[in-house]
Amino acid sequence: MANEFNYGTGRRKTATARTRLYAGSGQIVVNGRPFEDYFPRKSLQMIIRQPLVLTKNVERFDIKVNVCGGGVTGQAEAVRHGISRALLELEPELRGALKRAGFLTRDARKKERKKYGQRAARARYQYSKR
């Protein structure tokens, strides 16, 4: 029973989070470190806890996450997506609440590539009329 878990994969920009939910006491470990150490900003910690707070499961699960790629905000949102999917696998009746909050939707926005002949993705070089 100790090694039974529910799995969820979350993604955001270029970050990918592989999430495992175990029955436990509310401990969250990200890449082998407590999530308070891995994400020191309170806003990122809040983002990670959102699906647990919404479904009133904060103290019910231990969560282990492997996350790679992207920056800290993208990683935090990927973890939130992964936790939401793992919760859904465990309790399908939570779909409505998680869907309304937008935690099950993969945010598909990515950085637009730079085009040749331009300074950036959309910014042009300065035009001189004369």
Curated annotation (Swiss-Prot):
Residues 109-130 are annotated as: Disordered. GO terms for cellular component: cytosolic small ribosomal subunit. GO terms for biological process: translation. Pfam families: Ribosomal_S9 (PF00380). The keyword NAD does not apply. Gene3D superfamilies: 3.30.230.10. InterPro entries: Ribosomal_Su5_D2-typ_SF, Ribosomal_uS9, Ribosomal_uS9_bac/plastid, Ribosomal_uS9_CS, Ribsml_uS5_D2-typ_fold_subgr. Keywords: Ribonucleoprotein, Ribosomal protein. The keyword Glycoprotein does not apply. GO terms for molecular function: RNA binding; structural constituent of ribosome. NCBIfam families: PRK00132.1 (NF001099). Belongs to the universal ribosomal protein uS9 family. HAMAP family: Ribosomal_uS9_B (MF_00532_B). This is Small ribosomal subunit protein uS9. It comes from Nitratidesulfovibrio vulgaris (strain DSM 19637 / Miyazaki F) (Desulfovibrio vulgaris).
